């Protein structure tokens, strides 16, 4: 990625990007928020420090269900990690969510997803050189996001390749990461310190 494009992305991300819902200071938390923080720590063995969890903390009862869904994706996936990460990137690209994209583009590379596929998704293009299972997954996710439904042909291909459990997991993945993207886009959640945005907004 050229320096000029990086600079444009940084400017676009920074324009009007004030964090609307920053982390709640510990001394200002309600009892319900403190309990949600403790439950989060017990589930993830980590502190609740940033988005999307710090945003969800405004409604504490949302935190644990959202974390449990994330833990399923991490620890008990139906699909291989390479396909799971591709599905997540498709959702993050659709909603231009740089926070999820930055985290999961690195995870996708570790899972074996080709860099050319990642680059094409980032640019909003259907990748040209995908494995067959990646093509089936991409078409499923893109069609569901764009058309809000699936054709019989697209559903049949996904069902034949991934089975009923895989199809349901794919729909859940897209819904879950769209949900997180909507939460963070509403809050204008910033990237971690030192991170650079990798996604430009789609033309209006």
Question: What label would you give each PLM region?
Answer:
Residues 1-8:
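Sec-dependent signal peptide recognition
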Residues 17-204:
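Hydrophobic alpha-helical segments
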Residues 12-14:
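N-terminal signal peptide c-region/cleavage motif recognized by signal peptidases
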